[in-house]
Amino acid sequence: VGEPAVSARPAPDLVVLGGTVLTLDRGGTRASALAARDGRIAEIGDDRSIAALAGPGTTVLDLAGRTVVPGFVESHNHPSFFGMALAAPVDAGSPPNDRISDIADRVRQAARDFGPGEWIKGFRYDDTLLADNRHPTRHDLDPASPRNPVLLTHVTGHFSVANSAALRAVGITAATPDPPGGAIARDERGEPTGLLIETAAFLVNSAMPSQGPDELAAALQLADAEYLRNGVTSVHDTGIGLIGGEQELAAYRMLTSAGKLRTRIHGYLFHTLLPGLAEGAPESPDPSNPDGFTMNGIKIVADGSIQGRTGCLAEGYTCDPDEHGMMLLEPDELSRRIAALDAAGWQVAVHGNGDAAIDAIIDGYARLGAPEGTGRRHRIEHCQTAREDQLDRMAENGIAASFFIKHVYYWGDRHRDVFLGPERARRISPLASARSRGIHFGLHSDTPVTPVPPLEGIWCAVARQTSSGQLLGPEQAIDVEAALRGYTIDAAYLAGEEESKGSIEVGKLADLIVLSEDPTAVDPSRIRDLTVDATVIGGRLVWQRDPVPAGGAR
């Protein structure tokens, strides 16, 4: 596959040989070796022809029977949020915490290291995994930290819990009205409990000490290291500014301009930060982006989360039939913003979990007319409860999707038994139905909502197995190669980057990963247990699990 190099051609910077190369090109080509030069794939072929290209300065990576695939493209993640969670003084997740009292103990321990009045942040709490089966309140946190404001962020990012000191700092009282698109939870006397729902969480964020570019840059570098460890070479940051506002953009540009961020970033600015959008005249994308960072998309959040009962459903929640969730923007306003962004040249990515929200998003996109030729590839994020009729409309209108496939494993049991009931739950992330209609879609982990590993997401798409070991909608499973494409070439398509990344083809970026085994050849149940052994970006080995075997690199 590929012509032998002529003698005058410069030696490649990298040669990879001795294993299996899954190119994921249109023909499903396989090879045993490849060469990269100047950051791009230069040759693909057999061991003998590729080895002959190596020169004195060539890095030679011996696969020793392992498998190379294109670098994973994460089509929906939150690197700043992820990095802040990694650096946070309180890990509020489950595991390690079984009860709210365990989280309170961690807050108490952290408070010993903070001066009076300093903010203590925690991330990843999940009420659905706690034995208490509820959100913490200020009454749980106050004894652990009476002098320090505390803010715990839910694993979904759709809720926060503040202690009394934090509520005082921002001035939230019984008289504070609920903000548009959010709610302040209150007790029977009307006093805030500390739980802040959806946009209400932004009220506390505004009172916290501002996070400057340096702090956010450090968080991004923490996330960057974890991405490389898991074979992620490109990330769609779907919500730049959600954590640090405009300072996030400054942090990205600072890092990428200095070459200190190795993962390639395709950014979607949070819509509230775009000048002119509220007035219907948004600024257009800035074409001047530093190498490794592109931002020509805007993120809008239409509803909340199913497990938080804020995802907007056409039929009520199984556990509370009168509850339908909430829209964070009214449908008419959502459509108005979509139209204004499209006219200004932006790609639009709208978060939609509940089917009522998905209806509103499709309506907004459908009003734009035929999408052919614009190249903007407007998207629905998560698209969790899409019905068959909605998938028909998505196909008709050229609407793409990024499916949060790991919902099946992490929350599938509760979706079936608590939130959605068996019939709706078996259809979450309907990949097979979407694929049968030719809908373009990627797969994602929404980190830090779920752990990074794309191999786990690929397994979820193939196995449709919940955390209790039960199958959930096995008819919506897809095959291994299709799932691999959902984390590579099909994810690249969502950002309009399929011509430069997502498959191993001559001329494309040399973004590659080495897997311990061929995921298309092992028992599907083992896919999530495979390891990423090395990550290559632009032809450079940027991470490896263990030293390359003797003679394997020089």
Language-model region placement:
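A generic structural signal for residues embedded in beta-strands
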Residues: 43-44, 122, 512-515, 544
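Acidic (Asp/Glu)-rich catalytic clusters
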Residues: 255-258, 283-293, 370-373, 394-398
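Bacterial Sec-dependent signal peptides at the C-terminal "C-region" and cleavage site
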Residues: 1-9
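Divalent metal-binding segments
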Residues: 9-17, 22, 26-280, 300, ...
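Beta-rich accessory regions
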Residues: 534, 538-540, 545-546, 552
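Non-cysteine beta-strand/loop elements that form the S-adenosyl-L-methionine
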Residues: 78, 290-310, 399-409
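His/Asp/Glu-enriched, well-ordered alpha-helical/loop segment
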Residues: 339-349, 353-378, 382, 388-392, ...
